[in-house]
Amino acid sequence: MESKFKQLSDTEQELEISFSPDEFQPELDKQYKLAQAKAHLKGFRKGKAPLQMIKKMLGRDIQYQVVEELAGKNFESVAKENDLKLVGQAKIRHYELAENEKLSIYLIYEVHPAFELKPFNEYEFKKAEYQVSDETVEKELKKLLQSKGNMVAVEGAAAPTDIVIGDVQKLDADGTAIVGERQENQSFRLEYMKDDSPFFTALNGVNKGEERRVEVEVKEEDVPEENKKQTFLISVKEIKRMELPELTDELVKELSRGKNETVQDFRDELRKQIEAYFTNKSEEDLMESVAQKFLEENVFTAPSSLIKMYEDMLLDNAKRQIGGAFPPGFDETYYRAEIRPNAEKHARWMLIRNKIAELNGIEVSDDDIKALAEKEAKLTGAEATEEFVNTYFSEQYKPYVIDTLLRDKIYEFIKANTKIEVESKLPEAAV
């Protein structure tokens, strides 16, 4: 058996495997005879049809079966001997057969692209250290209390947290009401509007019975220039405000489902949750910056099959977020095209991480897996630690565990070998 490689692109190769007659002909003859023994051909008893007729009628199928078997048996060993870093499965491109002389099988497959990782020890990143204030805790507490509150109509000027209800009339350039462009009883929740929003500016402080004119600039490119500026007249009919209940020990027990007994315990627990959220956010934001920097500095082509794998993952995630399936008529082809750049980034970042691990001897040991299993068992309060360990070492779960641990180790290595500036920051929004 001989093998010959041909580079088709940065990520695609062709392998030609050639066999001598003694390596393929015996198996080919065997399959011809097996087909002859099973054949029911008109004019012949079972198994008595001439071999040449069998070859003429079934030869191509039999040959391809033998080619597939030989390719399957030998490709893995050739790939291992030549240290091929495969992505996905190899495919038979075509084959050339001269019986009793030579068989050549041509396979195409994808490999990890060859690239030199740029030095990164001088990379600089900023990491936010969020300061959770009493004010932040109170804001989140208020959000939780809203589930037990009641909306009540109020007199006086609308506060920045109120809901303004009114009729909206669209006006033309001359200020005249446009027929058919009136919407009644529209709700404007000021709390969720930006401070510089035209609607917030107009309605904050408004009173029941007053009118406010709002000018909005449409930014969509497909809107004609003459329609870029739109004017609305809002007639305020009612102002509603959330009336919150008093936070008591009894309400705390209900909100926490019995986990907390007192108001102070509840506040302390809420602060811990907010701090944990922002600690995690800080880490995720840093890792996003790290990935972006490495992608900018290391430009190469990712294998198409790897990109498709991430496309499929992003597609499945999108489906899960809307109940498991896209609505009828959804253009999946268009959506794939939209998410492909993101999938390509995921693929390239995975290859960069693997390169970092390879160059720096970063590996995951069985002790690492066992330690994680024991840690998770302890966190969940599970008594059967051994069951956790067995699950983490199972054939189904182990690859996922290794990938998670390896990714974490690589991140820690990057953080230890780059410059990270910690900056104090106030939370913009909490959990």
Swiss-Prot record:
Catalyses which reaction(s): [protein]-peptidylproline (omega=180) = [protein]-peptidylproline (omega=0)
A single GO CC term for this protein reads:
cytoplasm
Keywords attached to this entry: Cell cycle, Cell division, Chaperone, Cytoplasm, Isomerase, Rotamase
Annotated ranges, domain PPIase FKBP-type = 161-245
User: So which residues are the signal peptide here?
Assistant: none
Name the major location. Answer: cytoplasm
Q: Name one GO molecular function term.
A: peptidyl-prolyl cis-trans isomerase activity
Disulfide pairs?
Answer: none
For the keyword Nucleotide-binding, the answer is no
The source's domain of life comes to Bacteria
* Compartments where located: Cytoplasm
Q: Which InterPro entries match?
A: PPIase_dom_sf, Trig_fac, Trigger_fac_C, Trigger_fac_C_sf, Trigger_fac_ribosome-bd_bac, Trigger_fac_ribosome-bd_sf, Trigger_fact/SurA_dom_sf
Q: Which GO terms describe its biological process?
A: 'de novo' cotranslational protein folding; cell division; chaperone-mediated protein folding; protein transport; protein unfolding
Question: Recorded E.C. number(s)?
Answer: 5.2.1.8
Spell out the family assignment given in the record's similarity comment: Belongs to the FKBP-type PPIase family. Tig subfamily.
Free-text comment about domains: Consists of 3 domains; the N-terminus binds the ribosome, the middle domain has PPIase activity, while the C-terminus has intrinsic chaperone activity on its own.
Q: What does this protein do?
A: Involved in protein export. Acts as a chaperone by maintaining the newly synthesized protein in an open conformation. Functions as a peptidyl-prolyl cis-trans isomerase.
Name listed for the protein in its UniProt record: Trigger factor
Query: From which organism does this entry originate?
Result: Chloroherpeton thalassium (strain ATCC 35110 / GB-78)
Q: Identify the gene encoding this protein.
A: tig
